[in-house]
């Protein structure tokens, strides 16, 4: 019985590994902060949060990693991002006005390049925190909405 269980677990691990071969890879670099923008968050922590967020949103089509694989089997895309503006949220305004006003917001500019360095997505967006995630920790409340926006743009670009 134990051997059978070990065999099944090994087979499952092998099938997961084989199914990920050939899928395009998205490498998520740490975002940078534009000159003059004071952002109270750690960009490396934001990167570590973006990777699993993008895995959830794009995991069926792409392998999402934080570092470029040494021997990639398929297409490799690289995500570069910059926070070009940031506005802190206003708790009093959220409490009094409601309806999502006073949320933390950030202006982001990001691009995705293919292996040859050709830009396949070049976008500038304003991202606001989700209404239900107002009290997040040290990388702020923007990781999830940034990942949602980037995943949406990748789907729109129909990368393969």
Regions from the language model: what does each represent?
Residues 4-59, 63, 122-127, 151-160:
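A structural "domain/chain start" motif
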Residues 26-28, 54, 79, 110-112, ...:
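Hydrophobic beta-strand residues in large extracellular and virion-surface proteins
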Residues 60-72:
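Short, well-structured beta-strand/strand-turn elements
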């Amino acid at each position: 019985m134990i051997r059978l269980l070990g065999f099944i677990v090994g087979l499952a691990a092998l099938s997961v590994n084989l199914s990920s071969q050939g899928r395009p890879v998205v490498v998520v670099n740490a975002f940078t902060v534009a000159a003059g923008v004071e952002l109270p968050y750690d960009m490396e922590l934001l990167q570590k949060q973006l990777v699993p967020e993008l895995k959830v949103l794009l995991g069926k089509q792409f392998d999402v990693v934080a570092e470029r694989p040494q021997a990639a089997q398929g297409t490799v895309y690289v995500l570069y991002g910059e926070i070009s503006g940031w506005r802190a949220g206003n708790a009093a305004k959220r409490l009094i006005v409601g309806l999502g006003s006073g949320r933390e917001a950030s202006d982001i500019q990001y691009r995705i390049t293919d292996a040859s360095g050709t830009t396949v997505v070049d976008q500038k967006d304003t991202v606001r925190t989700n209404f239900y995630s107002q009290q997040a920790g040290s990388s702020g409340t923007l990781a999830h909405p940034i990942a949602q926006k980037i995943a949406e743009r990748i789907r729109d670009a129909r990368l393969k």
